[in-house]
Regions:
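Terminal amphipathic alpha-helical/low-complexity segments used for targeting or macromolecular assembly
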Residues: 1-157, 279-286
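Short regulatory "switch" loops immediately downstream of catalytic or recognition motifs
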Residues: 80, 205-211
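Short helix-capping and hinge/turn segments at secondary-structure transitions, especially at repeat
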Residues: 144-148, 160-164, 178
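Extended hydrophobic/aromatic segments used for targeting, binding, or gating
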Residues: 212-218
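C-terminal functional extensions of proteins
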Residues: 255-258, 276-277, 284-286
Length: 286
């Protein structure tokens, strides 16, 4: 029996791998290089904030900008057919960078002013995953609004893989946005977030079950200005609005709107008793 299996195995694996090969061959493939996009994002962010402190000379700074623009055009050429449109899209993105940088500096200042653990701007720039995710989102959102395929999702999913923060590039997020810790945050495609909003780890701004036919409808909640959402809260639905100046407590589950100046919290009973009231179990095993 062992001899028969040995003889059949190469034929079996050949057929199995061939079927995989054929399915891959039949699938429409994008020519875009995922690693190329990710490397470009890292280079852009380093240049945007001079994280490695290597641009003491303005001419060097300008030259790097031109190089980044050429690299972007090379990336865009994989998903945009028209050469003139590639140049237009690239120019539009770099024309927007000054405004993007201004908005991001406001996000950075918000973290510094609100988070007592943040000791300096450099610490936030180098070590805070929340700010990294916000930066990548604001970059990806420009491409999303230009209707450029694939690239916006590659950017945000790259950051998702590094930080655990999942922000769809199509979401609308206002200024002075603050993410604390960040792990497990999900912000869906049609989410609208106002200014001065603070979100903690594990928060989901998601959709209720929607058919594919209604994919273009607003499926995710609206968070108005000056709202704080604490850890592991879940807010679902395109008709759900959290009013101005509201606070959503940890572990809250919401599928309906909340008026302005609301405090929403999950109420559960916690009892504290003396250990002596509970005899130690003889069969307790870890």
């Amino acid at each position: 029996m062992k001899l028969v299996i040995t003889r059949l195995a190469p034929y079996y694996f050949y057929n199995m791998s061939y079927s995989i090969y054929i399915r891959n061959l039949e699938r429409t493939k994008s020519p875009i290089n995922k690693n190329q996009v990710e490397n470009w994002v890292d280079e852009l962010i380093n240049w945007l904030y001079d994280i490695n402190q290597e641009y003491n000379n303005y001419r060097f700074f300008q030259n790097k900008e031109k190089l980044l623009q050429l690299k972007l055009q090379d990336i865009l050429a994989n998903v945009v057919d028209d050469t003139d449109q590639i140049i237009v899209n690239s120019n539009h993105f770099f024309d927007r960078l000054e405004q993007i940088h201004f908005v991001l500096i406001n996000d950075l200042e918000t973290i510094i002013n609100f988070d007592p653990a943040a000791k300096s701007k450099e610490e936030v720039l180098i070590a805070y995953p929340g700010f990294f995710a916000i930066t990548a989102y604001r970059i990806a959102n420009v491409f999303w609004k230009l209707n450029i395929p694939i690239i916006p999702r590659i950017i945000t999913e790259y950051v998702h893989s590094k930080t655990g923060i999942d922000i769809h590039p199509g979401a609308e997020i206002g200024e002075k946005f603050f993410i604390d810790h960040g792990t497990g945050i999900v912000i869906g495609e049609t989410t609208k977030i106002g200014n001065n909003v603070k979100i903690y780890q594990g928060v989901t701004l998601g959709a209720l079950s929607v058919s594919k036919d209604n994919a273009s409808a607003k499926r995710h909640p609206t968070i108005e200005n000056n709202v704080t959402i604490y850890a592991n809260a879940t807010i679902l639905g395109g008709n759900t609005t959290i009013g101005v100046n509201s606070v959503i407590g940890g572990n809250v589950w919401l599928t309906h709107s909340v008026p302005e100046n609301s405090l929403v919290y999950h109420k559960s009973e916690i009892e504290i008793k003396k250990k002596s009231e509970f005899p130690e179990a003889l069969n307790y095993v870890i």
